[in-house]
């Protein structure tokens, strides 16, 4: 009988699943070097092979989506470096690796070292943008760290001469390939910083294989570039070649020629800038001179205006003007006094009582005549309107209608009868004629029918 605190019991499926998850999650992706054997490629396009060394072997699978990126055909017995994930094939419990990438062993080991150093330096922060130094603009002196016999130096000097012939260049000759190259590059960077002769450095070489460029993947070179006080432009190989030095440098140029373009200014552009600056200076000078000339003219004119003789002349002119104004004012005043006297004389004559009485009598006579004429006209118009009104009243008077043979019948209460339905038998009616009134009693009421107008058919 099992104890109450017995360990967990796995099924085979659960055991294989647990082991697979442990391998995939704990091991992750690894680099493995070994010799290929038992290489097969079925119709599916996947690769199946074994990696082995002197004492052990492991089954491998590389699926079609991954192996199509491999640039060579794997051969039996070939040494390779693979990047793979470790897993377990659960149905059989077979431990195997799933290969993601494959390289020949020599180049593969270098690539592995490259990736490891890149990850290490990136973790330390040597690639961070906050440490990148700005390039001087413009550069007053350029230092070049490269081989004095290489094509890279020729390209750099050619571009600098074409763009900015006056820019000083200091060459720090060093090996760029071989075992001694990293140490020489480091010493050249340190020497340039010690002398402090230039304000920007170009570190680089021409293109080549991964082994040829390996000096610029050296950790010592990377740390020397990072420690440099002088900004460094890396120019290693071609545009597709990326080294550790490119990540650490303050700026990466795709080629040595491009690096020379970056640190120099175009001579034609400089000439255009100089011409533009000269034009601006000439315009500023012209404006300044014109402004000073205008100011001088204003001051000169002001001084002339303040001259004593000119002031005396102005005062003399003003005195003469005042005298003329006084004479003119006196003459005007005398003239206005004479005119006032004449006006008063005329008013006095006009105010004579005899003249006023005569004018008043004439005015009274005119008013009496106009009043009599107005009264006669109004009386005639009133008589005419009265006659017209009498004639109109006679024409519309009911008495005139009765005089022509008509009569008006009304009930005892005075209501005029218009229809027989207003009359009842036995009621008293009053009939008004042209020459008197007849009072009668209703003995019968007969209603006449209205005749319909007959229309003829067409």
UniProtKB/Swiss-Prot annotation:
Reactions catalysed according to its record: Exonucleolytic cleavage in either 5'- to 3'- or 3'- to 5'-direction to yield nucleoside 5'-phosphates
Q: Coiled-coil regions in this chain? A: none
- Read off the Pfam families from this record: Exonuc_VII_L, tRNA_anti_2
Enzyme nomenclature, EC number: 3.1.11.6
Instruction: Report keywords, A-Z.
Output: Cytoplasm, Exonuclease, Hydrolase, Nuclease
Q: What is its main location?
A: cytoplasm
GO terms assigned for molecular function: exodeoxyribonuclease VII activity; nucleic acid binding
Q: Which GO terms describe its biological process?
A: DNA catabolic process
Keyword Coiled coil listed:
no
Function statement: Bidirectionally degrades single-stranded DNA into large acid-insoluble oligonucleotides, which are then degraded further into small acid-soluble oligonucleotides.
Record text on subunit structure and interactions:
Heterooligomer composed of large and small subunits.
The name this protein carries in UniProt is Exodeoxyribonuclease 7 large subunit
Organism of provenance: Escherichia coli O81 (strain ED1a)
State the taxonomy lineage: Bacteria, Pseudomonadati, Pseudomonadota, Gammaproteobacteria, Enterobacterales
Name the gene: xseA
